[in-house]
Each structure stands twice: as structure tokens, then as C-alpha cells.
Regions:
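PLP-dependent enzyme catalytic core of the Aspartate aminotransferase-like
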Residues: 1-3, 305-345
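Glycine-rich phosphate-binding segment of PLP-dependent enzymes
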Residues: 7-13, 17-50
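Structural signature of PLP-dependent enzymes
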Residues: 44-46, 229-271
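Conserved beta-loop-alpha segment that forms the PLP phosphate-binding cup at the N-terminus of a helix
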Residues: 49-92, 102-104
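PLP-dependent aminotransferase-like
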Residues: 79, 83-139
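Active-site PLP attachment segment
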Residues: 188-223
Length: 345
């Protein structure tokens, strides 16, 4: 495994939440594809580029367990959401989460939608439901996994929300979720999910996708062609979209059940270890389930110690954020904890 992800050979990489790793095989595919473009020029664009995008849609439909007609390629999660918001009536009231990914609030604000926010807490899902009962909302928009704290929204709770508010449109930023956790779009009650490929899907930059229910398009009185027209202003990079298709196919070749189980085990192990050391925010420690992303309460000096020990992570707010993916090992987590314990003594 490590040989396919060269970065893993020279560091303890706990930074997938910031940037997923390139595989050696993806690099080889991109190199061969670029050389094909060099040789064929316009024929590459008119022939192979089309098939590359078709394959990306096909692989994503398998990953998301949905029909290909529900998949729309974009350059990123934010680009897809930004475009899609153009088709939502301006009088719709949004419910957001406080301290969610900043661009979500910024886009809703830029589009001049009225919105309210629910504060982060250990009982977030119940707080969302309570707020929905207090006043009328047309759209609930949130990240499945919080980029900062790593809080994992209980996706099973969506059913309870939809049962009580069947007309509510639920839109989800799945960038920190898809590729990390199991998900079945057709069985879910989410109306639309927006994803970037460069984190947990390990697809490099410049690619992403939307997954939209037909019932949502009908509700908004728009067609798939309307969505394509929103996203196809200009052009997409075939190499970026092809990388998404290749990376998703490669990820599925590892057996997704094994990938997700490994993530669950590593995440639980790290969660308990950090909770024991009192390094997590209280509202995170009090929850039963968590993602594989953690922001720990340590200062900049400790961040520098982690860097000196060749542990890749990133500063977030007043703490340090780490994340584990299937290519990490328990030994790497133990090494991180060892460095951490030694530094805080």
C-alpha cells in the first residue's frame, strides 16, 4: 500500500482532511493521458476526452450507488454548489450550521438568501430538529463532516427530519465524508450532495461532482440539461475529470467495505485516545460517534514539535487538526500519540 502512495514512505501523513494523496498509479495514468493529448491534439478532445468524462460519471454512480443520470461533474464542491444555488428561489429560507465550512455561509450570503444558524453542540441533530419546528425553512444545508472539529452528523437522523418535514430540501457538502464513510445516495433521504475529489477520494485538484435526486429537480422545476448548462460554462479539464474517475475506480478496487472498516477502527482508536487525554472539545467528547478528523487543543509550540517529528498535520484555529485514512496504520497513530505525550509532559 505505501509503495502506491510515495508520500507515506517519508512521513507520518495525518493530513488527508487537508489534501488526499496521489497514488503512483494515478500519476502514471495522468502521464500517459497527457502524452496521448500531445500526440492527438484536437482528436483527443473530440474523442478520448468524452470517454474519460463518461467513465468518471460511471465510476461515481457505482460509488454513490445511484444512476448515472443523477451525477453531474464539476470542478469542485463549492463551484457546483455555487452554480446550483442559482436555481433555488430567492425567497427560500436556509438553515445552516454555525462554524460550518466558511464558503457555505458566504455563498448563501452572496446569493442574498435569508438564513439562520444552529450552534455546534453534542446534541446537534436534536437542535436542528428543534429549530426546524420553531420557524419555517425550505432548505437545510450543512457539511456531513465538519472540516474543523470533525463532527460527524448522524446521517440516520435525516430520516427523522424528513419524516416530519417532507418538503424540506436537504443539501449536503460531502467533501469530508464521501470516500471516508459508507453512503448510499438512492437509499438516503438527502436531496443533493456536493463533493470535491482532492481529499478522501484521492483524485487530485480541479474535480468534483454533484449528486442530485430527480425529485429535487422536479421540485425546482429544472431539468438535467439546466444543471449541465450551469456547470458547463466554459470548459472542464479532461485530465482532472479523468483523475476523478481513475481514483474512484482505484479506491473501489481496494474493497470499500475494508476501506470503511479500517477508517472506523482507526477513527475510534484515535477518538478514545484523545478523549482520554482531554484534548478534544467537550461537545465532541460527549458524542457517541465521530469521523476520522480531529482538532486537538494544543498550542503552536506543539505543532512545531509534530512537524519536527515529520508528522504532517495543519493548524486550525487555536488547535491542530489531524486525520486518518485507510492508508494509515495503528503504529502511525501510536507514534503520533507518543510524540504528543512526550511534548505535553
Amino acid at each position: 500500500m505505501k509503495s502506491n502512495y510515495p508520500t507515506l514512505e517519508n512521513c507520518t501523513y495525518l493530513n488527508t482532511a487537508y489534501c488526499g494523496l496521489y497514488s503512483e498509479r494515478l500519476l502514471q495514468w495522468r502521464t500517459e493521458t497527457d502524452l496521448d493529448f500531445v500526440a492527438k491534439g484536437d482528436y483527443f478532445k473530440s474523442e478520448r476526452a468524452i470517454n474519460i468524462e463518461k467513465n468518471a460519471v460511471h465510476q461515481l454512480s457505482k460509488l454513490m450507488r445511484t444512476e448515472e443520470t443523477n451525477i453531474f461533474l464539476s470542478t469542485s464542491c463549492s463551484a457546483g454548489l455555487e452554480a446550483f444555488l442559482l436555481k433555488i428561489p430567492k425567497d427560500f429560507h436556509f438553515l445552516l450550521l454555525n462554524d460550518d465550512y466558511p464558503s457555505i455561509t458566504e455563498m448563501v450570503t452572496d446569493h442574498q438568501f435569508k438564513f439562520s444558524e444552529v450552534s455546534m453542540s453534542s446534541t446537534l441533530e436534536s437542535s436542528v430538529l428543534e429549530e426546524l419546528r420553531n420557524r419555517p425553512y425550505q432548505v437545510l444545508l450543512f457539511s456531513a463532516v465538519q472540516y474543523n472539529s470533525g463532527l460527524l452528523f448522524d446521517m440516520n437522523f435525516i430520516e427523522e427530519i424528513k419524516n416530519e418535514f417532507p418538503e424540506l430540501i436537504i443539501l449536503v457538502d460531502g467533501t469530508q465524508y464521501i470516500g471516508n464513510q459508507p453512503f448510499d445516495f438512492n437509499r438516503s433521504l438527502i436531496d443533493g450532495i456536493f463533493v470535491s475529489g482532492y481529499k478522501w477520494l484521492l483524485a487530485g485538484h480541479g474535480n468534483g461532482f454533484l449528486c442530485l435526486k430527480k425529485s429535487l429537480l422536479n421540485r425546482l422545476k429544472i431539468s438535467a440539461i439546466d444543471v449541465f448548462n450551469l456547470l458547463d460554462r466554459g470548459h472542464r479539464a479532461p485530465i482532472a475529470m479523468g483523475s476523478l474517475g481513475f481514483a474512484v475506480e482505484e479506491l473501489m478496487s481496494y474493497d470499500l467495505d475494508v476501506v470503511f472498516q479500517k477508517n472506523k477502527e482507526l477513527g475510534n482508536y484515535l477518538f478514545e485516545a484523545l478523549k482520554k487525554r482531554n484534548l478534544l472539545e467537550d461537545f465532541i467528547s460527549e458524542r457517541k460517534k465521530h469521523s476520522t478528523i480531529f482538532t486537538i487543543k494544543v498550542n503552536k509550540a506543539l505543532f512545531e514539535i509534530l512537524k519536527k517529528n515529520n508528522i504532517r498535520c495543519i493548524q486550525r484555529g487555536s488547535g491542530v487538526r489531524i486525520a486518518v485514512h485507510f492508508y494509515n496504520t495503528k503504529a502511525e497513530v501510536d507514534f503520533f500519540l507518543q510524540v504528543l505525550d512526550k511534548a505535553v509532559k
